[in-house]
């Protein structure tokens, strides 16, 4: 899992797993999900991030968490 903030795009992207994006669905005005060909969730994008989170909280917010297999 990887969390990335793009200040220029004013967006946050949470990568849940690797794979090829087959389709993208907008769940709300500022919430978009990427799905693979089977409909599995690959990532979540939150737009207009600066309206939701204080800019100083986002200054260096890039987190990568390896997911282990169970």
Show the residue positions of the predicted features:
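Amphipathic, hydrophobic secondary-structure cores in small proteins
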Residues: 12-49
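Alpha-crystallin/small heat shock protein
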Residues: 2-5, 59
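C-terminal structural segments of small proteins and small subunits
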Residues: 43-70
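Short linear motifs in intrinsically disordered/low-complexity regions
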Residues: 7, 35-37, 61-63
